[in-house]
Amino acid sequence: MIDLPARLEPVLAGLGYELVMLERAGRGLLRIFIDKPGGVTIDDCVAVSNHLTHLFTVENIDYDRLEVSSPGLDRPLVKPQDYARFAGEQVTLKLRVPMDNRRRLSGQLLGLESDAVKLVVDGREMSVDLRNVDAARLKPMV
């Protein structure tokens, strides 16, 4: 079985994109989220989709439908380097184990330090062990 994220990361990097996340959904759907500095356009998604369709055919990767999209305004933070890249932005963390009787924390991301997510919540600096973060997303300012 091929490690698809490991196979796609260098391919997408060569095209100028970052693999944010990959998920397999029902009915053979393969959903791929990409990003690049300055954001992703529909033309970027089409170009990546066309490239990957050919790659998957050559490498005999099983899927029925391919969906390529941007991660959206509420982009998930999935890699440790995401926490440094988006320092200063507003984020929402969903915790595995509650802290201060809260399972969700929202505040300004300060970064990642020694496997701990640093953020300011309600004017107070907090440190959350990265292993306790179930999900993290940018919180778009509207």
Swiss-Prot record:
Q: Which GO terms describe its biological process?
A: ribosomal small subunit assembly; translation
Q: Which GO terms describe its cellular component?
A: cytosol
- List where in the cell it is found: Cytoplasm
Could you list this entry's UniProt keywords, alphabetically sorted: Cytoplasm, Ribosome biogenesis
Superkingdom: Bacteria
A Pfam family:
RimP_N
Q: What does the UniProt record say this protein does?
A: Required for maturation of 30S ribosomal subunits.
Q: PANTHER family recorded for this chain? A: RIBOSOME MATURATION FACTOR RIMP
Tell me which NCBIfam families the record gives. PRK00092.2-1
Which family does this protein fall into?
Belongs to the RimP family.
This chain's protein is named Ribosome maturation factor RimP
Q: Which organism is it from?
A: Thiobacillus denitrificans (strain ATCC 25259 / T1)
Its taxonomic path starts at: Bacteria, Pseudomonadati, Pseudomonadota, Betaproteobacteria, Nitrosomonadales
What would be the name of the gene that encodes this protein? rimP
